[in-house]
Amino acid sequence: MDFKDGFFRNDEEHQLKIIQVIRKYQPDFIFCNAPDDRHIDHPKGSQLIVEASFLSGLSKINTVDFLENTQKQWRPKNIYHYIQWKNLDPDFIFDVSGFHNTKMDAVKCYSSQFYDPKSKEPETPISTKNFLDFVKSRANDFGRLIGVEHGEGFISNRKLGFSSFDELI
């Protein structure tokens, strides 16, 4: 999408790019950055996703795909914000016990951002030696709160509804 780190905006140009992607893939759920975070791109990106998701459901906003075909309106049913740097209260916690190691492996794919004892780069808050331990500890704590090994907390833009108490753990 070619959004510039630190300098993208929640404006028509960037919203239309997000709308094109939403209409192409037609997701029911979108997971995006926290609405409040240390890094300025995270809350900006979060709000951009929320607004573009709403706009993607409006028929009067016209977009075309990469082959110049007119796209149909589509609005995701749910937007969930994962929790990043700040200790935000989740609206719900998902049991990720069976997937925690996979998540940590995925996080480590961005190795240049995290602790490397051989790095000559200046230290950042997420490149400290203990940052990945913090990520693990948060998953352990969220898991503790719902009685499982590991949990992932999310913030929802709307109230969550359930049709059965059997869905709750």
Please state what every model-predicted region is:
Residues 9-169:
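Metal-dependent de-N-acetylase/amidase catalytic core
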Residues 1-6:
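A conserved beta-strand->alpha-helix junction
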